[in-house]
Design a protein with these regions (language model features):
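Long, charge-rich low-complexity segments
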Residues: 79-94, 197-211
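Polytopic transmembrane helical bundles with strong interfacial aromatic enrichment
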Residues: 3-6, 121, 168-169, 197
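A structural-propensity feature for long, helix-poor, extended segments
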Residues: 51-89, 189
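Short, hydrophobic/aliphatic alpha-helical segments
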Residues: 3-21
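Conserved phosphate/anionic-ligand binding catalytic regions in large, soluble enzymes, centered on
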Residues: 17-38, 144-162
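Preference for long, well-ordered alpha-helical segments
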Residues: 129-132, 144-204
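Phosphate-handling active-site elements
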Residues: 38-58
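Amphipathic alpha-helical interface segments
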Residues: 80, 84-153, 157, 169
Length: 211
């Protein structure tokens, strides 16, 4: 099943079902893509306007990157679903003998490590999305400033949601040194970019609520 080819209605129905995919990781990627798309919309509402001629080149560059970033996050919706199969297969391996148990442990460890890769990439893309949205909020059309704030909120939510999909896998890893390294990378992204997204949201809120 190609997740990004589903209608909104079908995707949500699948998400609500007991099917293992789509799940939190794929949804995080989709929400991140929506956040980046909103930022891109701000840019497209800004370009070509005389009032913003001084930042036209900047906005055009932002739009080019935002368009590519959205597509990268869309691809990660499917990548997350694809990554679940090896993990599920690993959990299903027999462990009746010492040899089987050792084999299962090795395969599961590898699958858990691999399962962290997609949500970490989602986080990295969402972090980049937040950086783009900072510029859209600062340079984009004031008529679309609320959309820039929404974009920041969505990218932040996706970043945080993806982090949980890292932590659920690192918690189960036998190699605690490797798990700690992945957790540290995740924490670093959270520590920096949650604050940056919050700053954009606060700035936009201030503009909307104060004359």
């Amino acid at each position: 099943m190609e997740m990004t080819k589903l209608s909104c209605e079908k995707f949500l129905a699948e998400l609500a079902s007991k099917a293992p995919t789509p799940g939190g990781g794929g949804t995080a990627a989709l929400v991140g893509a929506a956040g980046v798309a909103l930022g891109n919309m701000v840019g497209n509402l800004t370009t070509g306007k005389k009032k913003y001629a001084a930042v036209e080149a900047d906005i055009q560059a932002l739009n080019t990157r935002a368009d590519a970033l959205r597509k990268e996050l869309e691809a990660l919706v499917q990548a997350d679903a694809d990554a679940f199969a090896p993990l599920a297969a690993a959990y299903g391996l027999p462990k009746d003998t010492p040899e089987q148990a050792a084999h299962k442990a090795a395969v599961l460890e590898k699958a858990l490590d691999a399962a962290c890769a997609v949500p970490l990439e989602v986080m990295e893309k969402c972090a980049e999305g937040i950086a783009l949205v900072e510029e859209y909020a600062a340079k984009g059309s004031v008529m679309a400033v609320s959309d820039a704030g929404c974009a920041a909120a969505l990218c932040k939510a996706a970043l945080q949601a993806a982090s949980l999909n890292v932590f659920i896998n690192t918690k189960l890893m036998a190699d605690r040194e490797r798990a700690a390294a992945l957790d540290a990378k995740t924490d670093k992204l959270l520590d920096e970019f949650v604050l940056r997204a919050d700053a954009v949201f606060a700035s936009v809120t201030n503009k909307l609520r104060n004359k």
